[in-house]
């Protein structure tokens, strides 16, 4: 379960921001999670509760926004929706389509005190 290490990285990023911005508590963390990534939202939520225990983020709410897959088809010069990695273009059928969205995990927003 690599979700633990992903959440540990998020908590480390939050701790780094605390040192820069001098806040005392995190109330909410919003993640942008790619639908084509290999992290499961429910597993991230489960790990979040365990990993944040005893940290500045303990008790914070975790919101997860799912980013749908998109790619650029160089054959038909269009941005197209992707439902899986390494898929052919749903418009022209050519492959490969260069993925442009849907594989990310980013901290999009934090509410702090």
Curated annotation (Swiss-Prot):
Origin: domain of life: Bacteria
Keyword Nucleus assigned: no
Gene Ontology BP annotations: protein maturation; protein modification process
Record's keyword annotation contains Heme: no
GO MF annotations in UniProt: nickel cation binding; zinc ion binding
Family as reported in the entry's similarity comment: Belongs to the HypA/HybF family.
Naturally occurring in which organism (per UniProt): Methylocella silvestris (strain DSM 15510 / CIP 108128 / LMG 27833 / NCIMB 13906 / BL2)
Function, as annotated: Involved in the maturation of [NiFe] hydrogenases. Required for nickel insertion into the metal center of the hydrogenase.
Residues passing through the membrane, by range: none
Name this protein carries in UniProt: Hydrogenase maturation factor HypA
Keywords: Metal-binding, Nickel, Zinc
Binding of Zn(2+), residues: 73, 76, 89, 92
Pfam family, one: HypA
Gene: hypA
Binding-site list for Ni(2+): 2
